[in-house]
Curated annotation (Swiss-Prot):
Protein name as annotated: ATP synthase subunit alpha
Chain positions of site Required for activity: S362
InterPro entries recorded: ATP_synth_asu-like_sf, ATP_synth_asu_C, ATP_synth_asu_C_sf, ATP_synth_F1_a_nt-bd_dom, ATP_synth_F1_asu, ATPase_a/bsu_AS, ATPase_F1/V1/A1_a/bsu_N, ATPase_F1/V1/A1_a/bsu_N_sf
Gene: atpA
Species this chain originates from: Mycoplasma mobile (strain ATCC 43663 / 163K / NCTC 11711) (Mesomycoplasma mobile)
Cysteine pairs bridged by disulfides in the record: none
Amino acid sequence: MSIKASDISSIIKQQIKDFNVTSDKKEIGEILTVGDGIAYVSGLENARLGELVVFENENYGLVLNLEEYAVGVAIMDGSNDLIEGQKVRRTGKVISVKVGDQLIGRVLNGLGEPIDGLGQITSTKTRKIFQIAPGVMTRKEVNVPLDTGIITIDSMIPIGRGQRELIIGDRQTGKTAIAMDTIINQKDKDVLCIYVAIGQKNSSIAQIVQKLKDHDAMKYTTVINSSASELAPLQYIAPYTGVTIAEEWMANGKDVLIVYDDLSKHAIAYRTLSLLLRRPPGREAFPGDVFYLHSQLLERAARVTKEFGGGSITALPIVETQSGDISAYIPTNIISITDGQIFTIESLFKSGQRPAIDIGFSVSRVGSAAQIPAIKSFASSLKLELAQYNEVKAFAQFGSDLDETTTNILKHGQKIYEILKQSQYSPISQFYQAIILLAIKEKLISQIPVEKIRKYRSELIKFIKNNSEIIALRPIIEKEKINNDIKEKLIYSIKSFVKKFILENDIIIDNGQNNDVQFINKK
């Protein structure tokens, strides 16, 4: 069989016609400029927003800007090794992270890679870190309580599984302490925890990890650390990495608690990125999409129906204010996104009230739906009593002659604040909280001097622990509505304890109208 020259010629012409000389150029680009953790790359015409690219030094970058002649890439690591003219390769993949139970008890960086020296994570399952939040029909009502172990929160600002509750306040007012106590209180409650540290000091995170280990909390906790020394892109990515890991557990029917500490620094990292990418600045130099930055993150916290796994993600974002100003840009944004806020104030903290929560400004929009019936019943008037106390206290400063009712409100309010004081790492279970709240409601603290209130609380818990009749009622008190018979039994037990406590502590009851008490002066 002979081959004609004309056939060969036509085949070659066809192949030349079909040959695409631009295909390779679109996959491999070149660095135009590099600096401050940002590289501008030409030639990646088909790059997608959020896509990973690989530099010559095998480090990754994240495409954040798509412009006419170049793309803006955030460098994840090794920016000092990059120079103009180096090649950049597309991966065709968006950024994703390993997920699964292997991550429990580990300390990871912002990309989900282990930094605790305990070996690599061998899980093969991954999830994209930028996901759409669950839709309306996917969600379930938030009505299962998430116990914090903090009486002030569980009684007046209850948090439900699937809720987003903001912890907001000035620096050094105990915001992280509230989040840490909540994580520690999840022991034996079948809740997995994720602590995301954004822009914190490495020494602070080391202390937090050690405290979690000391309280056996690392057995159900994952720590993600993107410290202040790391590049802004890693700080920007970290919370999305955390919620992606949480979503895998939620899809498997598990309840997850995630803490973002803190979103103020996250917003600053994003502002840094945006300014370096030459995006137009807006209010306080933040870019126009800073609201979406946090709404897309926090909306991923939910309690979903069984068809979508039946699990939940409860988010506790932390935001730092300046001089108590909650009307600043980032605080108001996040307040409007979340389902309530816990507001910590410096004056309360310095006065010794721990946790330093301002009850007047703090609110939970889920409310009593996320409380056990006993606490819902016994704490129903607590917030009102404290509001009356604060109002009367303000007026009492202007005059010395106070009537009996006003005096009683002041004394009772002072004792309530004292009994609500809680030192860090000492959570109280909801069963004992219910007993304490009943004692407050029935005025069974009125005969106890303020100085003895905290001792009264700890002794009451010990007394109940040794009362087999009340301990037998624990399953009912923790889950069911309390009937009058059970309530009377509890009141009788508390009254018995009060008599015992008064005798043991040499307290004399003043028979006057104010029912005041004083110590016996022993010579």
